């Protein structure tokens, strides 16, 4: 068990008749908010996918808000979230708080067009998928071919979602490519930088 697992706040709601305790993530879910605040692995992806499917089943015509503060992670796990976002009927509003790096940046850009946001001090980072291979040469060839396929897939998604030419995406993702919220806006990763919900 990670230390952060022990620090999840509980929210208590009171009505005239009873009290009910929720962990903070369950309480946010009541308001159609999903919070991706960890590195993306299969476990995290399964939780996010389940929440997206639940909220769509509850009301497919209402938006789902996906808040992102993640360093990225597993591409295959991230693609499970991406595919679900594209599959469900509900619009998915993406909001970057803190950072959206690597696969998390792909998810940020994959929200519903016109509904992709970043807070002013957010950081977004793109790069090529990471991987490695060892073993017999034939196995290394197989793994290399798959890594190149995934790299091309991610670059194609980013090109479609940002409107940037594929060759620019390929150049920019060749190494870590950091952007401020406003640079991400100019790049087409987000549609607006939001300073306050009050405005």
Swiss-Prot record:
Annotated Pfam families: CLP_protease
Entry keyword Cytoplasm: yes
GO CC annotations, alphabetized: cytoplasm; endopeptidase Clp complex
SUPFAM superfamilies for the chain: ClpP/crotonase
One GO MF term: ATP-dependent peptidase activity
Alphabetically ordered keywords of this record: Cytoplasm, Hydrolase, Protease, Serine protease
The UniProt record lists the keyword Lipid metabolism: no
Domain of life where this protein originates: Bacteria
Catalytic activity, reaction form: Hydrolysis of proteins to small peptides in the presence of ATP and magnesium. alpha-casein is the usual test substrate. In the absence of ATP, only oligopeptides shorter than five residues are hydrolyzed (such as succinyl-Leu-Tyr-|-NHMec, and Leu-Tyr-Leu-|-Tyr-Trp, in which cleavage of the -Tyr-|-Leu- and -Tyr-|-Trp bonds also occurs)
Subunit structure: Fourteen ClpP subunits assemble into 2 heptameric rings which stack back to back to give a disk-like structure with a central cavity, resembling the structure of eukaryotic proteasomes.
HAMAP family with a match to the protein in the record: ClpP
PANTHER family to which the protein is assigned, alphabetical: ATP-DEPENDENT CLP PROTEASE PROTEOLYTIC SUBUNIT
Protein name per its UniProtKB record: ATP-dependent Clp protease proteolytic subunit
Higher taxonomy: Bacteria, Thermotogati, Thermotogota, Thermotogae, Thermotogales
